[in-house]
């Protein structure tokens, strides 16, 4: 095998790494010592397993592959060390030429209970065996005059609608025929009274034949124009061939995006208002977003005023809800970034979906290919493991959300060629404590330490004043998205929603999701000890975190010199508490705290045990190496 290690398919590399990671430490170190003779570099790679939870075999092979090591060298080394099972994984793989084929149709015989991705894979397998496959079709709910102008491949009978768009499929055998079921999205769009399908003449007239004066932006896969129809503004996205695209890529891209758009119906997902599949061009029609993109507003494009913190947090909350909704439909967006978060006249975020993918159902379909110069523009929002391996999972979207949260928090662009490092993710991840400093992470949490440093160094100053606890909570949510491999979007959404409620000036009992230091499910366990960190329980510094501590350690109401309640958290809170939160107490008032002091070490251990049961931390991080 003359190919290089970095040319190994991702699924082969996955199997190999899983096998090698299961070796004893002695056997693995023996293998690694033949690859790397520099003990410092070897220890650095070995520490990644404990600090970052990555596959050390993958890191080792990546390091070796970047030095032009071949697959044959790897096989020879494995055989020399008598690691025959790992060697056989590579030997079972045979390089095969890439097969390019159009997106297959959905045959009528597909059973409704099968997921869409499984149906697609089945059709692909049939095509590889030489069986003919029909072109995919997408019916529009428009009127018959509009249908007269549709191309042939867009004029199927209603019973041939893709099964993936059927939302109310019956489960019992005595239910009505599947062919009469209409998707919710199509019902909603039909009620609007306008046809989804636009004729070529309508699009040309609305955009003045795609006049360059109407161009809003130019992207990798499409040009965006502004147009009008019946006095109403629209945005037209005209797909175009790229220098590296394969033949027929526009048709595949068009059909895939249309399929995704028709499945989505969420207030924070950009709706599709129409489409046009003409001979000269393919175009989508979207509502016009008066406030442009989040990226433009964060960078002050067009002289716009900086977004205030309540609006920033509200946009982040809407973005996270949109991604969580897509993941619930088993859709991976794969291109979440601030330029794809559009803002309407009310600054409500709408997530555009130019590169959405259906979640895969088998190992081979979990990987994607992307040309290098296209990847560079999106690499600022992609995790390192995706860039190296190409494995497309929900983790990619969650990581991208973390970068957008960081952009909102810091006001720093995700990519700046005049900055070192160029990518914001590298700037932030460099602030993760080193392996030596992270020894204290079992007590305070790496994300919390990282969040505090980010707030101290990079917090946006031009958007007004942000309470310290809110800033750290928002930064911690971003760090969880960037660092953890199994982050729960629901957990991050809850934290951002709590910050949003706080900034709106309301009392809230939303849980802090275990993100802020000093909270947790075990914090109500009384423990008397001498080694208590009194600084975290100091009553004089508890004003900033009082609204958030209510979910774990309820505070007793205290009175100022005038006899008015200063802080109230719990069922006894009345209407006067909301107006008094955040007021500084008179200097001559003595505060008394009746809180139970908690053994910090034991509390943190119990929290980690709960996280371990939820599979959010591994045993090495819990008990140490």
Curated annotation (Swiss-Prot):
Phosphoserine modification, residue list: 144
Pfam families for this protein: Death, Pkinase
Q: Which CDD domains match?
A: Death_IRAK2 (cd08795), STKc_IRAK2 (cd14157)
Its GO biological process annotations read: canonical NF-kappaB signal transduction; inflammatory response; interleukin-1-mediated signaling pathway; intracellular signal transduction; lipopolysaccharide-mediated signaling pathway; MyD88-dependent toll-like receptor signaling pathway; negative regulation of canonical NF-kappaB signal transduction; positive regulation of canonical NF-kappaB signal transduction
Q: Which UniProt keywords apply?
A: ATP-binding, Nucleotide-binding, Phosphoprotein
Q: What are the recorded GO MF terms, alphabetically?
A: ATP binding; molecular adaptor activity; protein heterodimerization activity; protein homodimerization activity; protein kinase activity; signaling adaptor activity
Q: Where is the composition biased (Polar residues)?
A: 169-181, 516-526
**Domain called Death: residue spans:** 13-94
Q: In which tissues is it expressed?
A: Expressed in spleen, thymus, prostate, lung, liver, skeletal muscle, kidney, pancreas and peripheral blood leukocytes.
In this protein, which residues make up the domain named Protein kinase? 210-489
Per the record, its GO cellular-component terms are: cytoplasm; cytosol; endosome membrane; nucleus; plasma membrane
Question: Region labeled Disordered — which residues?
Answer: 111-181, 510-540
Work out whether the entry's keyword set contains Metal-binding. Answer: no
- Result for mutant: residue 421 to T: In a lung adenocarcinoma sample; somatic mutation
Where, by residue number, does ATP bind?
216-224, 237, 337-340
Its function, per the record, reads: Binds to the IL-1 type I receptor following IL-1 engagement, triggering intracellular signaling cascades leading to transcriptional up-regulation and mRNA stabilization.
Summarize subunit and interaction data from the UniProt record for this chain: Interacts with MYD88. IL-1 stimulation leads to the formation of a signaling complex which dissociates from the IL-1 receptor following the binding of PELI1.
Q: What is known of its domains?
A: The protein kinase domain is predicted to be catalytically inactive.
- Family recorded in the similarity comment: Belongs to the protein kinase superfamily. TKL Ser/Thr protein kinase family. Pelle subfamily.
Which protein are we looking at?
Interleukin-1 receptor-associated kinase-like 2
This chain's source organism reads Homo sapiens
């Amino acid at each position: 095998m003359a190919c290089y290690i970095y040319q190994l398919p991702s699924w082969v590399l996955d199997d190999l790494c899983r096998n090698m990671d299961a070796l004893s430490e002695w056997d693995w170190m023996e293998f690694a010592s033949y690859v790397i003779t520099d003990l410092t570099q070897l220890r650095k790679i070995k520490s990644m397993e404990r600090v970052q939870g990555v596959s050390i075999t993958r890191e080792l092979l990546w390091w070796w592959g970047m030095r032009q090591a071949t697959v044959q060298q790897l096989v020879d080394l494995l055989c020399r060390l008598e690691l025959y099972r790992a060697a056989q994984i590579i030997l079972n793989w045979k390089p095969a030429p890439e097969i390019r084929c159009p997106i297959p149709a959905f045959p009528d015989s597909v059973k409704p209970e099968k997921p869409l991705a499984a149906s697609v894979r089945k059709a692909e397998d049939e095509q590889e065996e030489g069986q003919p496959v029909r072109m995919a079709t997408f019916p529009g709910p428009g009127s018959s005059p509009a249908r007269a102008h549709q191309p042939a491949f867009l004029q199927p009978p209603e019973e041939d609608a893709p099964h993936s768009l059927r939302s109310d499929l019956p489960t019992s055998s005595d239910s009505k025929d599947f062919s009469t079921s209409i998707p919710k999205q199509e019902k909603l769009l039909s009620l609007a009274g306008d046809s989804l399908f636009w004729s070529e003449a309508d699009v040309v007239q609305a955009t003045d034949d795609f006049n360059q004066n109407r161009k809003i932006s130019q992207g990798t896969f499409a040009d965006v124009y502004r147009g009008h129809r019946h006095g109403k503004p629209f945005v037209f996205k005209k797909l175009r061939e790229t220098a590296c695209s394969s033949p027929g890529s526009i048709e595949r891209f068009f059909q895939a995006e249309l399929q995704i758009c028709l499945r989505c119906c969420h207030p924070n997902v950009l709706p599709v208002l129409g489409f046009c599949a003409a001979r000269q061009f393919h175009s989508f029609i979207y509502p016009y977003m008066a406030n442009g993109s989040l990226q433009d507003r964060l960078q002050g494009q067009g002289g716009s005023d900086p977004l205030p913190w309540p609006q920033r947090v509200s946009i982040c909350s809407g973005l996270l809800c949109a991604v969580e909704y897509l993941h619930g439909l088993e859709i991976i967006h794969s291109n979440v970034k601030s330029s794809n978060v559009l803002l309407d006249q009310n600054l409500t975020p709408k997530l555009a979906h130019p590169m959405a993918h259906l979640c895969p159902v088998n190992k081979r379909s979990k990987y994607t290919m992307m040309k290098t110069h296209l990847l560079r523009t999106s690499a600022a929002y992609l995790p390192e493991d995706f860039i190296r391996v190409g494995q497309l999972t929900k983790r990619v979207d969650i990581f991208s959300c973390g970068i957008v949260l960081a952009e909102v928090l810091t006001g720093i662009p995700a990519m700046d060629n005049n900055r070192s490092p160029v990518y914001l993710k590298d700037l932030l991840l460099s602030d993760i404590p080193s392996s030596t400093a992270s020894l204290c992470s079992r007590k305070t949490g790496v994300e919390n330490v990282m969040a505090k440093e980010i707030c101290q160094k990079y917090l946006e100053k031009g958007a007004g004043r942000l309470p310290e606890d809110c800033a750290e909570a928002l930064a911690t949510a971003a760090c969880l998205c960037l660092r953890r491999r199994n982050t729960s979007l629901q957990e991050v959404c809850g934290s951002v929603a709590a910050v949003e409620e706080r900034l709106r000036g309301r009392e809230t009992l939303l849980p802090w999701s275990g993100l802020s230091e000093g909270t947790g499910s075990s914090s109500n366990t009384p423990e008397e000890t001498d080694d208590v960190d009194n600084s975290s329980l100091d009553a004089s510094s508890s004003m900033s975190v009082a609204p958030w501590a209510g979910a774990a350690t309820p505070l007793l109401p205290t009175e100022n010199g005038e006899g008015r309640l200063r802080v109230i958290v719990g069922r006894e809170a009345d209407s006067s508490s909301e107006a008094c939160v955040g007021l500084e107490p008179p200097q001559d008032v003595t505060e008394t705290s009746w809180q139970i002091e908690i053994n910090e070490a034991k509390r943190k251990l119990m929290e980690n045990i709960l996280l371990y049961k939820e599979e959010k931390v591994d045993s090495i991080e819990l008990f140490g190496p």
